[in-house]
């Protein structure tokens, strides 16, 4: 009621759905006035309605089927289809794109399987995921009860997905998928390091990496970051540039590892000497002083947002700084790896810039702190 009142206060219509005893197996009860009929009818005005939700298991299918029941009670011959990107039904089961989907849903324990219903109905091999295939007999029975007959013979029939036809560079898709699998792995192991939970997900991701024929060193950025960390004794970041080269950045007296990396990466894509000091001391020192003297920070080093602000200020009077700043767009889509878990501030800024971030699952200091 609190949430519904809040929505009403914002002028957002809200409808209630109720628990149905025996859902989803008691088809006769579900498709009745005591099942879907209890749910409040959502009135629509357009011929095509998109139903979206925050994530898996949040009620999209149940909402659609409930609406089908009400629409047919109102005499409207409504239908339902799902727009779902992954898995890609007409790519092989072991294609890295489909394996990457398993990595993305490792917390749900989703697995890609052959759609046995589609194979039986059409003698064609297609890929779907286990939850849809397992639930299809129930979904088909519900639709038969509502519509009189099911328009679909398989879970694949229910989907609209043209991704497989849109691939123009299969090698690029395979590489990007493998990178995504590795990123999912490091996100999971970092979560275990932070929270102490999620070991099962990590174990599944290890199996998924083996299935894809890769390991955690797939990105050259990882070995570059860890190697330089051994040489410098401090946190290091590394990034794979658009030209395939790898640039690193280490923690210094003025900049954190993420800030140092972003500056070196910008210099690289802008053709500026990496040894050149682009940001003036006059731009850095006031920010450091503000942090330590007035904002209570013990870390005088600039985070990435502060570094980019200092670079922006300097660019007003320096052509070189302006040139370096203009390289930001070229970093979108690059992969970065850090030898320690970086701060949420740095990670947020890098993600806003479109940079993919992975971290070794360890903190910079005392085993559980980052600065």
Which residue ranges define each predicted feature?
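Flexible phosphate-sensing "switch/lid" loops adjacent to ATP/NTP-binding sites
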Residues: 1-52, 67-229, 234, 241-243, ...
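The conserved Walker
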Residues: 55-56
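Hydrophobic positions on the alpha1 helix immediately C-terminal to the Walker A/P-loop
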Residues: 63
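Residue-level structural signal for beta-strand termini and adjacent loop
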Residues: 79, 251-253
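Short, conserved beta-strand edge motifs with alternating hydrophobic and charged residues
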Residues: 236-240, 280-282
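A short, polar/charged loop-to-alpha-helix boundary motif
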Residues: 254-270
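Short HxH-centered metal-ligating active-site micro-motif
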Residues: 268-300
């Amino acid at each position: 009621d609190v949430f519904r009142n809040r929505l009403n206060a914002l002028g957002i219509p809200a409808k209630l759905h109720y628990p149905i005893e025996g859902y989803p197996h008691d088809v006769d009860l579900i498709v009745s006035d005591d099942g879907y009929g209890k749910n409040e009818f959502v009135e629509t005005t357009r011929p095509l309605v998109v139903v979206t939700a925050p994530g898996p298991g949040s009620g999209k299918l149940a909402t659609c089927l409930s609406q089908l029941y009400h629409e047919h009670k109102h005499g409207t011959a409504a239908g339902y289809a799902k727009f779902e990107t992954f898995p890609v039904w007409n790519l092989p089961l072991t294609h890295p794109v489909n394996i990457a989907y398993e990595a993305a849903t490792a917390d749900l324990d989703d697995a890609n399987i052959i759609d046995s219903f589609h194979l039986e109905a059409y003698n064609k091999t297609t890929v779907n995921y286990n939850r849809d295939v397992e639930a299809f007999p129930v979904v088909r029975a519900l639709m038969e009860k509502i519509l009189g007959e099911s328009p679909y013979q398989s879970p694949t029939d229910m989907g609209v997905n043209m991704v497989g036809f849109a691939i123009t560079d299969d090698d690029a898709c395979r590489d990007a998928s493998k990178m995504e699998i590795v990123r999912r792995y490091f996100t999971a192991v970092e979560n275990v390091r932070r929270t102490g939970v999620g070991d099962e997900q990590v174990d599944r991701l290890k199996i998924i990496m083996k299935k894809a024929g890769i390991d955690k060193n797939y990105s050259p950025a990882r070995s570059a970051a860890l190697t330089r960390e051994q040489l410098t004794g401090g946190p290091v970041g590394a990034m794979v540039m658009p030209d395939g080269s790898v640039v690193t950045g280490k923690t210094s007296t003025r900049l954190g590892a993420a800030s140092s990396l972003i500056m070196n990466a910008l210099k690289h894509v802008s053709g500026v000497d990496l040894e050149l000091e682009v940001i003036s001391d006059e731009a850095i020192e006031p920010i450091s002083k503000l942090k330590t003297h007035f904002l209570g920070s013990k870390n005088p080093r600039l985070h990435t947002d502060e570094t980019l602000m200092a670079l922006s200020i300097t660019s007003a009077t320096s052509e070189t700084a302006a040139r370096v700043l203009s390289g930001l767009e070229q970093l979108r889509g690059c992969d970065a790896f850090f030898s320690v878990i970086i701060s949420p501030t740095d990670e947020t800024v890098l993600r806003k810039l479109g940079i993919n971030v992975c971290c070794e699952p360890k903190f910079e200091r005392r085993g559980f702190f980052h600065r």
